[in-house]
């Protein structure tokens, strides 16, 4: 897995004796839910590191969004509406550290939600779609596979460079960060979670 240097940003050092209050919010993709590997293992990792978890669940979203900008925008707006409704009771100001973990279209939802609600979050962006970069402004790390049919690798590289986002590229991995070789996919997942752990 190719990678660039990962830098820690916006990390708050607690006063001596104070336990940091941390929350992680999971923003899934349209068909990639929190029980699938990238989000499942990320969730377990951050739980072990003391984060409270909030799982966003979307309602019905449009199908056939791939390659259809209008449907993609419609899906994004609906997903953002669902997320906003579910997260409105959380007082993010009460947390010392806020982490948004997102997948695919969820990367746009997470970025837009943070921006609209003035939430200072760090992000883990799994396989963002090109449209996501219109909303991505905050620091984080990005994961992308070169066989992802939803996003061109050169475009992802360019957009990450513009925003100074560390980008982890896996050769021949698809939109789920898998290659079809089960043993290799397990090794890929291990590397991804290790990189996520280093970012935290």
Task: Please identify what each model-predicted range represents.
Residues 21-94:
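Serine-hydrolase catalytic machinery in alpha/beta-hydrolase-like enzymes
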Residues 101-110:
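Gly/Ala-rich beta-loop-alpha elbow adjacent to hydrolase catalytic centers
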Residues 119-129:
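A conserved short beta-strand
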Residues 142-144, 148:
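Short beta-strand/loop motif that positions the catalytic acidic residue
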Residues 149-155:
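Conserved alpha/beta-hydrolase "acid-adjacent" motif
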Residues 173-187:
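Catalytic histidine-centered segment of alpha/beta-hydrolase-like enzymes
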């Amino acid at each position: 897995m190719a990678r660039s240097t990962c830098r820690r940003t916006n990390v708050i050092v607690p006063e001596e004796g104070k336990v940091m209050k941390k929350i992680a919010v999971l923003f899934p993709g349209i068909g990639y839910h929190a029980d699938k590997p990238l989000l499942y293992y990320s969730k377990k990792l951050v739980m072990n590191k003391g984060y409270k978890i909030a799982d966003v669940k979307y309602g019905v979203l449009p199908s056939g969004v791939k390659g259809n900008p209008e449907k993609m925008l419609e899906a994004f707006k609906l997903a953002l509406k669902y997320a906003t409704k579910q997260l409105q009771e959380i007082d993010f100001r009460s947390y010392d550290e806020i982490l948004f973990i997102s997948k695919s279209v969820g990367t746009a939802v997470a970025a837009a939600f943070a921006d609209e609600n003035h939430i200072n979050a760090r992000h883990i962006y799994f396989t963002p779609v090109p449209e996501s970069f219109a909303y991505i402004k905050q620091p984080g790390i990005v994961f992308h596979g070169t066989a992802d049919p939803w996003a061109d690798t050169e475009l992802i590289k360019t957009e990450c460079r513009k925003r100074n986002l560390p980008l982890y590229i896996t050769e021949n991995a698809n939109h789920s960060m898998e290659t079809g070789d089960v043993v290799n996919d397990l090794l890929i997942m291990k590397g991804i979670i290790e990189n996520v752990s280093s970012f935290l």
